[in-house]
């Protein structure tokens, strides 16, 4: 069974949906985004301890501060490549960014190969089921340009501004 809870965000952001298996967070996405539409069938709304912890984390984050803890989560379907990309995204600090190309270069270096596809990295970034906590919004295109965002470009812009991140609108 999958349980859900709505998180009401501050003005300027779409509200969010949290999902859980009953113990761990299994999803966090903006409502009305392309990510949300994948997850809306067969869910039961319920108050759970993991939702309280996630709400606390989000409250701190949306106040413009970096939370000093991470809610416990589980990611289903995490391939080794997606895990590599997810681990790198989690290393991007509040207020910082990386490009798809920079992530690809790190993976290539780690694997001792000449080159890794930035487009493949983009696919793994876009797959992320736990937005903000795994900060896919901090990944930018070449020259710090905005690219698509599963949570909606409006939300990506607002998240980057909240963190004081400069970017180029394309």
Q: Which positions does each model-derived feature cover?
A:
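Basic nucleic-acid-binding alpha-helical/helix-turn surface characteristic of O6-alkylguanine DNA
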Residues: 1-112, 116, 166-170
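Short, flexible micro-motifs
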Residues: 30, 67, 98, 125-129, ...
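A broad detector of the eukaryotic-type serine/threonine protein kinase catalytic domain
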Residues: 90, 108, 126, 141-144
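Flexible, gly/pro- and Lys/Arg-enriched active-site loops
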Residues: 113-119, 146-151
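Regulatory, non-catalytic segments
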Residues: 114-130
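Short Lys/Arg-enriched helix C-cap and helix-to-coil transition segments
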Residues: 132-139
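…primarily DNA-binding HTH/wHTH and HhH modules…
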Residues: 142-170
